[in-house]
Amino acid sequence: MKTPLFCQEEKSISTAFPFLLLNSDAISAGKGEVGVASSPDIFSQRVNASKYIFLPTSSAVAINYMPFTHRAVRDVFLGGITFYKKRVRDAFGANFSYFSIGDVNLTQEIGQQTYILGTFKPTEFSLEGSYSLQLSQSFAMGVSTRFLSSQLSVPSQGKSVARALAFDIAGYFYSQEHFISSLLYRYTFGFQLSNVGTKVKYDDLGRSFYLPTQLKLGAGFLLQTDSYNEWELSIEAQKYLVPTPNEQGVPDKDIIEALVSSFSDAPNGFREEFHEINWAVGLEYKYNQSFFLRSGFFYQHKNKGDRKFLSIGAGFTFFNNWQMDVAYPFSFSTYKNPFHTFKLNLIYRFGQ
């Protein structure tokens, strides 16, 4: 009988287009990056498009921004623009996200001299759309498609642009109103299978990378104490659905096989599979739907990325149709993550 070798070193999972896992939405980021089952907002496009069905306004547009914080680099950022349109029983959403990695100097050494040949600006972007349909009074589902493009290598070095297609499927349950004495409450559930798609090669000779496919499950509880004050608590679990690296590297599997086997392929068995689950909890206070305070906590195991942070956030509406949100995380990781920085949103709601 073979005995599992639990002493093997656990390895973190690397994927193509890692910027898809960077959260530049200040609403979600302020709540520990929960989103799959939290209350709907315009940035539901990325975390659970089916939530658009339950928004009170028919359409809105928003921009979001997150900079890279390092004294030596000032032009690295992730930003995006999002739009949605809701009808009676369905909704459409669209998003464009752009990740700039700044200017890279191309140099050549001749003798003891280093010459600058020019500059190169690595970038990645995603263009996506979604469709959501209300299936019952309290439940909706949505699908999203996503075109991805990455230019990380120097154009003269063979293949310079990597492209991929991906899709999401999501569902959201938003309960009817219930009462405990004079207190009104709702409960929510959500799921999302995200970034299912083609494998990616960044150059002609390199290996293929999986997209950052994830399964997210979440639940939420909304409590309204009176007509002005509302509280929301959300919890979420996230699991990579790509092969876990072993001693030989990353197994080469087709997409369906990778999805199915990702629940049981970790070299250290169930313990390592459990370590691959990220956990998040978020709390939000709303006053008259015009002022918001948020906080949350995100946990990722130290062997699988070591992202641990406490986040805070706030938002407010102005001129009736506008809303601004900001969030900031306080990291507890053993290393400094340059993307643990502030996030900023600006939202405009039509016809409010």
Regions picked out by a protein language model, each given a short descriptive name:
Residues 3-7:
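Sec/Tat signal peptide C-region and signal peptidase I cleavage site
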Residues 8-352:
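Subset of outer-membrane beta-barrel
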